[in-house]
C-alpha cells in the first residue's frame, strides 16, 4: 500500500504485523501489512512569470472571421511564459497540470486543429492534450489551447545544492505509481489530469543522458502556449468574447 504526501516535511516508516489464527489448529501462519509514507525535507514553490497570466490582448471581432481554409479554427498564435520552481532543499518532484475549463474544449480533428504546437511545431489534432478557453456569451465553446515545455536551445535549467546541473526533460504517464516508469519526453506536451483518460502525465528532470529524476533545489521550464478558436459565425459578433482558460500547475513530490 503506497501513499504519497504533498508539501511534506519529514520522513516516517511504520510496520504493523497481523497474525492469522486458525480456530481448529494450534499452529499459525503469519502475514505482514506494511504502512509507509514519506515526508520530504524540502518544500517547493512554483511560480509562473507575468503573474500566471497569458494575455492575447484586445482585438476587433473581425479578427475572428472565417479562415476560408481547410482548418476551420482561427489561429491566435504563440505566447511564451516560464515556470520557475524553487525548493528549500534538494527534492524529487514531478510537474502536473489540471484543466479547470475542461468542459469548454473545442474538439480537435483533421479540420479543426492548433497549428504548429509545442517545440516540435506539430499540428495538434488530438483533443486529449488540449485545454479549454471558456464559453462565448451565446454558450458556444470558444476554442482550445496547447501548453508545452520548450526543450529547445537549452532552455531548461536546474540546480541542486552544489550548483547548476545539466538536465534532460523526462516524463511519466503514471506519476502517482509506487515506481513510475520514466522516459525521455517526445514533445513536452502538458496533458491535463482531468482530460487525459487513464494517464497521469508528469514531468521531471534527469541528469543529461539519464532517465531517473534528480533532486533539485531549482528548475526553470520555458512554456509554449498556442491557441486556436472558433470563428465568429459560431461565437457571434454582437457581444464581447473573452478568453477564459484556467489551468492549475502543481508540484508533486516523488
From Swiss-Prot:
Keywords: Cell membrane, Membrane, Signal, Transmembrane, Transmembrane helix. Pfam families: DUF1120. Coiled coil: none annotated. The chain crosses the membrane at residues 213-229. It is found in: Cell membrane. Disulfide bonds: none annotated. Residues 1-25 form the signal peptide. It is a single-pass membrane protein. Induction: Repressed by H-NS, induced by LeuO. A monocistronic operon. InterPro entries: DUF1120. GO terms for cellular component: outer membrane-bounded periplasmic space; plasma membrane. To E.coli YhcF. Involved in induction of the so-called NTR enzymes in response to nitrogen deprivation, as well as in glutamate biosynthesis. May mediate the glutamate-dependent repression of the GLT operon. This is Protein GltF. It comes from Escherichia coli (strain K12).
